[in-house]
């Protein structure tokens, strides 16, 4: 009996292994509740002459190596600046502790690694569905270690619908999304997206050796990760194949879809490039890109952090973000979805009810109608005076109509805060989702809207709170962000999770029936996606007017 117990203990404690497509066998970590392979390199270090360029697949042998801890996150920038000092005291702690706005340490330029978490005892022949996560962070910060996926895998086992969870690091800020004519002419735009795409190709090549099915991959992400997920739908005008097979069969987008951005060589991207060049001391160099590539990691970090962060004024006018490059992103993203140039896969897309409140906090100096108009003019340089007038009429200074929504006269910490918060949330997230759904005809569509924190002062159901329920807590939100997503990855139908409220498919925002799953602190219910029609018309009658 003792020998049997010893043998059983040894079997339980045995380190898991996986064999890659090239025949290399690697070892992971037995965490009892799951098995982890962490920090596997999928690309050559993007340093030196490879800085800012699309990634090069990793070529060295990994045979016999152990992968038991996360690799360093990619280099990031400070998203706050002096923003922390302007936060109201009752919102400061929540914002600063929000996972989406934390710089993930340690970080390094040699960072392009991938992680695989699978249920315990998974055999190579298991053929499990795969959930491939893309983290958020405003394209300026973040890392795969912050959103580990452990809860997703554990919950999938309890549901009897086991999945393998994959996450990757990708370059952010200037390292991944530097723009400008020099970058465009070299063909190096959107390097961070190329990192993500190469990681997807790594999954296609290797996930079968871990027990995953490469034909059952669901890509998903939150915030910048959600926008990235959308971009992969329209990448190459919707051709998502690799070696003749689709890289993914479904997509989930949590807060984000089309990116309202000018091309790589557009005005604002070029302005940011010039700021980095000047701050780095490369302004007089004959080859400015070569000069930037010759900088130390710390010097480039300082120059990058001198540019406006995601929470700087004017908020959400991001310094670094995906931009049309004419090759992989062939047009503006609204045009691509309108023209049907996307991969045809089932999708889930949803938002938090008060997506804009976090970002509205950076504009507390705007207190009058005149200042609000000037703020909109500064933020949207392509918009005509008439379009700004229409925007001002759609988003009035009536505090009962602003965000946090449905809070009446409360939470108006300045006369313009709720107005600006409503507009920012709708443009980047909530009503952009409606635009996507109205045009996307690529497969079955499901949509959600969370009001789970509607009573939270100042912030309401703020951007990024879904990650708390998805990775760390249990509640009605986690029923969607875990159970329903797991069912979708397995069966392409979130209702297979046994939800107590049937999740209707989405046809159009003008349909007569309920088409939106809504989440609150008490549970799940359905509703109509027909709110704020005047705001929708003001923002999306001519989307390029509001590009950055």
From Swiss-Prot:
Organism in which the protein naturally occurs: Diutina rugosa
PROSITE patterns, per the entry: CARBOXYLESTERASE_B_1, CARBOXYLESTERASE_B_2
Gene: LIP2
Cysteine pairs bridged by disulfides in the record: 74-111, 282-291
Biological process (GO), any one: lipid catabolic process
Signal peptide: 1-14
Keyword list, A-Z: Disulfide bond, Glycoprotein, Hydrolase, Lipid degradation, Lipid metabolism, Signal
Database matches in Gene3D superfamilies: alpha/beta hydrolase (3.40.50.1820)
Regions crossing the membrane: none
Protein name: Lipase 2
Family (UniProt): Belongs to the type-B carboxylesterase/lipase family.
Catalytic activity: a triacylglycerol + H2O = a diacylglycerol + a fatty acid + H(+)
Active site: 223, 355, 463
GO molecular function terms noted in the UniProt entry: triacylglycerol lipase activity
Glycosylation: residue positions: 365
InterPro entries from the UniProt entry: AB_hydrolase_fold (IPR029058), CarbesteraseB (IPR002018), Carboxylesterase_B_AS (IPR019826), Carboxylesterase_B_CS (IPR019819), Type-B_Carboxylest/Lipase (IPR050309)
EC number: 3.1.1.3
CDD domains reported for this sequence: Esterase_lipase (cd00312)
């Amino acid at each position: 009996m003792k020998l049997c117990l010893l043998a059983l203990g040894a079997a339980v404690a045995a380190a898991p292994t996986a064999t890659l497509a090239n025949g290399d066998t690697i070892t992971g970590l037995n965490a009892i509740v799951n098995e982890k392979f962490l920090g596997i390199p999928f690309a050559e270090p993007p340093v030196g002459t490879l800085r800012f360029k699309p990634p090069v697949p990793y070529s060295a042998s990994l045979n016999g190596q152990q992968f038991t801890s996360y690799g360093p996150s990619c280099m990031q920038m400070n998203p706050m600046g002096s923003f922390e000092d302007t936060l109201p005291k009752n919102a400061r702690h929540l914002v600063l502790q929000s996972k989406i706005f934390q710089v993930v340490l340690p970080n390094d330029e040699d960072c392009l690694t991938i992680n695989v978490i699978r249920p315990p005892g998974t055999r190579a022949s298991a053929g499990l569905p795969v959930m491939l996560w893309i983290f958020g962070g405003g394209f300026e910060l973040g890392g795969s270690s912050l959103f580990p996926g452990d809860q997703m895998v554990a919950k999938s086992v309890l549901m009897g619908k086991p999945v393998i969870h994959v996450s990757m690091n990708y370059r952010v800020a200037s390292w991944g999304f530097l723009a400008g004519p020099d970058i465009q002419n070299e063909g190096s735009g959107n390097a961070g997206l190329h990192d993500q795409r190469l990681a997807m190709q790594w999954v296609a090549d290797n996930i079968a050796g871990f027990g995953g099915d490469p034909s059952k991959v669901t890509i998903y992400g939150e915030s910048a990760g959600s926008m990235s997920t959308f971009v992969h739908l329209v990448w190459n005008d919707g051709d998502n194949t690799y070696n003749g097979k689709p890289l993914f069969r479904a997509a989930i987008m949590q807060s984000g879809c089309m990116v309202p951005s000018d091309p790589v060589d557009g005005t604002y991207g070029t302005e940011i490039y010039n700021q980095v060049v000047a701050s780095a001391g490369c302004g007089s160099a004959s080859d400015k890109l070569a000069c930037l590539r010759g900088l130390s990691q710390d010097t480039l970090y300082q120059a990058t952090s001198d540019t406006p962060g995601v929470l700087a004024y004017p908020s959400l006018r991001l310094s670094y973000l995906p931009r049309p490059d004419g090759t992989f992103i062939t047009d503006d993203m609204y045009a691509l979805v309108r023209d049907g140039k996307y991969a045809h896969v089932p999708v889930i897309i949803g938002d938090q009810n008060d997506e804009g409140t976090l970002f509205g906090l950076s504009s507390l100096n705007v207190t009058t109608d005149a200042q609000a108009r000037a703020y909109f003019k500064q933020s949207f340089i392509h918009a005509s005076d008439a379009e700004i007038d229409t925007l001002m009429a759609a988003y009035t200074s009536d505090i009962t109509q602003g965000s946090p929504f449905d809070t009446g006269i409360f939470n108006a910490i300045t006369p313009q805060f709720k107005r600006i918060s409503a507009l920012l949330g709708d443009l980047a997230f909530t009503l952009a989702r409606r635009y996507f759904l109205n045009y996307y005809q690529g497969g079955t569509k499901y949509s959600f809207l969370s009001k789970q924190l509607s009573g939270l002062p100042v912030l309401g159901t703020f951007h990024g709170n879904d990650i708390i329920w998805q990775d760390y807590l249990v509640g009605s939100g986690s029923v969607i962000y875990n159970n329903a997503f797991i069912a979708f990855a397995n069966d392409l139908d979130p209702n297979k999770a046994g939800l107590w409220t049937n999740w209707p498919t989405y046809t159009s925002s003008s349909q007569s029936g309920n088409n939106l799953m809504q989440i609150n602190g008490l549970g799940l219910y359905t509703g109509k996606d027909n709110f704020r029609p005047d705001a929708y018309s003001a923002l999306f009658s001519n989307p390029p007017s509001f590009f950055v």
